[in-house]
């Protein structure tokens, strides 16, 4: 079985030899056909610690490196996309403020 290769944005580089990569995917709703966006965060191994916040990277599936880390960074696609990181942080902040209030706005 071929290994998964995903492309995403580095949203955190605060851990040692690890980056958090946000991967977004789009798919049509099976019944209504509306395009739906979903995102997921993956922990990826970065042994040289050369990838920084905002970098667009490719990650590839690998053997388990730790409890949650099953990908490693393959290559840098584009550097310095801080606009994507800011969108993610704003969305996360809005979600956290909604959960503190106990529901939807």
Swiss-Prot record:
Q: Which superkingdom is the protein from?
A: Bacteria
InterPro entries on file: NA-bd_OB-fold, Ribosomal_uS17, Ribosomal_uS17_bact/chlr, Ribosomal_uS17_CS
* Keywords carried by this UniProt record: Ribonucleoprotein, Ribosomal protein, RNA-binding, rRNA-binding
In Swiss-Prot or TrEMBL terms, this protein is called: Small ribosomal subunit protein uS17
Q: Which GO terms describe its cellular component?
A: cytosolic small ribosomal subunit
Q: Is Metal-binding among this UniProt entry's keywords?
A: no
Instruction: Please list the GO biological process terms of this entry.
Output: translation
Q: Does Ion transport appear among the keywords?
A: no
Q: How does it assemble?
A: Part of the 30S ribosomal subunit.
This chain's function reads:
One of the primary rRNA binding proteins, it binds specifically to the 5'-end of 16S ribosomal RNA.
> What Pfam families does the entry give?
Ribosomal_S17 (PF00366)
Protein's organism: Thermus thermophilus
Show the NCBIfam families listed in the entry.
PRK05610.1, uS17_bact
Give the family this protein belongs to, as stated in its UniProt record: Belongs to the universal ribosomal protein uS17 family.
Q: Name one GO molecular function term.
A: rRNA binding
What PROSITE patterns does this protein map onto?
A: RIBOSOMAL_S17
